[in-house]
């Protein structure tokens, strides 16, 4: 009985990986064994950094809120404590946007919680 090989599936599998390796430098883009490892590593970095991205943005929002609050002589922690106590349901993303792009609206919130 002759050996059975599924060349169609094999080619499709390799083609998929090589397509993902487009734009890589050197042998990573055109040598199967190297490209396979490079794509696998890239996928693990992408997974890790999707989580990291959320942390980075949260810390950026906190920095922006802190900067806006300190202009009015209040620390970030004092401001956020008073925001929660007054029942203002704006999240950090929105507060940071107000502090950066709409300072007068942010100042109004600050005056409300003081």
From Swiss-Prot:
The keyword Ribosomal protein applies. GO terms for cellular component: ribonucleoprotein complex; ribosome. SUPFAM superfamilies: Ribosomal protein L20. GO terms for biological process: ribosomal large subunit assembly; translation. Keywords: Ribonucleoprotein, Ribosomal protein, RNA-binding, rRNA-binding. One of its GO terms (molecular function) is rRNA binding. HAMAP family: Ribosomal_bL20 (MF_00382). Belongs to the bacterial ribosomal protein bL20 family. Binds directly to 23S ribosomal RNA and is necessary for the in vitro assembly process of the 50S ribosomal subunit. It is not involved in the protein synthesizing functions of that subunit. This is Large ribosomal subunit protein bL20. It comes from Flavobacterium johnsoniae (strain ATCC 17061 / DSM 2064 / JCM 8514 / BCRC 14874 / CCUG 350202 / NBRC 14942 / NCIMB 11054 / UW101) (Cytophaga johnsonae).
